[in-house]
Amino acid sequence: MVNTKTRDASCLRRFICVTSALSVICFFLGYSYVVFYGVSEEESQHLNASKLTSSFVDILSKTIFERPELLMEPPEDSYPVYASLLETVTKWNPDDPEPPTTFKETIQRFNYSDELERSYAEKFRNAELPFKMYDIPDILMVTRKWDDEYLKQKMKYASAHVEESKSNHFMYWNGNRDRNVRQYVPPTDLVSMKFDDWLEIAKKADEIKSTNSTTHYYFMTGVSASDNLRSYISQDLSLFSTKKNNFFVSNVAANKGIQCRFGMRGIIAEAHFDSGRNMVAMIKGAKRYILNPPHECKKLGIISDLKHPSYRHSIIDWSDIDQATSRGFDSVNAIDTIVEAGEVLYIPSYWFHYIVSLQYSVQCNSRSGSPPNGEGQTEIEECLGSVRKW
């Protein structure tokens, strides 16, 4: 009979040998670093870490998508990595909220909680280039706090704006502008709806995988810059409601407050630009953003009439491939990215963005004025003539 203690000791030795061997393999595969001229050991470790974590599991399809390697500073000519807008909307039609397995991320993504990576992100922000951040403690707190019951309670006392569309497309329109422009007919209807009812519809849309031809509802709320932490939005998102300049609000005096958009599966916000630096925090769910630099303005069919209710928005239906082809989208530069809960996307001033809600989603953003050198403004003025700050 084999002694129990001897057998246990033998098993333990085998376990230690196996785990030790695995540790050695992992060390050589993952934790050895490459020596770069002019790059510190710490920075080199970050670069290798980015290779190890160059993929992520998408919350929608559980498909592993690739991510680009981490950059310490903006390269002169190789970032952003563009594809043609026609290729972008053809490979993944905006009317389809399901990400294809071939989707690749090309936009930089930095760890906000890491001081070194945060310094990289600051360089990209100052260069007016788009990027994403993650591991932001204040934002992660909100992603956990804003569950259904919390939002239902808070929304009882919040003012909201709800739009209805017979399809999944929502063209922005301003009811305060001249409605007589070309016998203007609003593209969506304003409706009265309680948040609880809207949430039920949004959750059902995910469950049944609603199509682009069904009626959609877009729920919007927000607070002004003068809210001063009075509402739950500015209290919970204090990074966007600061009295002192920070990474997210670089010019408090020009802060536009906080706008929150509650989206349901498939909702498309048509392409447009904003005149301020834009930090977009994804609180729940995920959205797809297609970005275009300001110099592409002339090719995007942007409404230039300052009196038009949909001023600064594209009149082109990007999900209509025939329109995209005839409008020359094959010569338009585009970036395609998915922003997931807990991430913040930086959209530089005057960059165009086209937004698709991939599922029930909550997104809050804050804009804080144009960059010091006014990057992007000249291209927009050459394209549209007079430009109204927005």
Model-predicted segments: where are they?
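N-terminal accessory scaffold of Fe(II)-dependent oxygenases
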Residues: 2-344, 352-390
